[in-house]
Amino acid sequence: MSKITIYQGDCLQKLKLLEDNSVDLIVTSPPYADQRKSTYGGVSTKEYVKWFLPISKELLRVLKPTGTFILNIKEKVQNGERSTYVLELILEMRKQGWLWTEEFIWHKKNSYPGKWPNRFRDAWERLLQFNKNKKFNM
């Protein structure tokens, strides 16, 4: 049987404990921009990409060449329009060396109506798949 190790703590600090090219699958759902401020302190949409890039750099380092990284993330509506921070993050991660290979939709059937008179509440979230190479395992 394989050994399983669980690390608890700040992901950026704990990732530094892992060897290069040692992880097969990474699935994460970091705090979305401007969400859960009381729990996580909140990261603004303007700062989100800058905040996440050091994490994605470490994830790229520890992921095996055939590994897969799944990022659960969601846009935020600000001042009547959707923020582009998720799209900006994808572009910056590509500059780091990530391949954006797939996108899945998580259909949230428990979504309830929003409080806005001119907008429906999203009943979905993105699951973005990134890989190091075009030949990868799922």
Where are these regions (language model features)?
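Core catalytic lobe of class I
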Residues: M1-M138
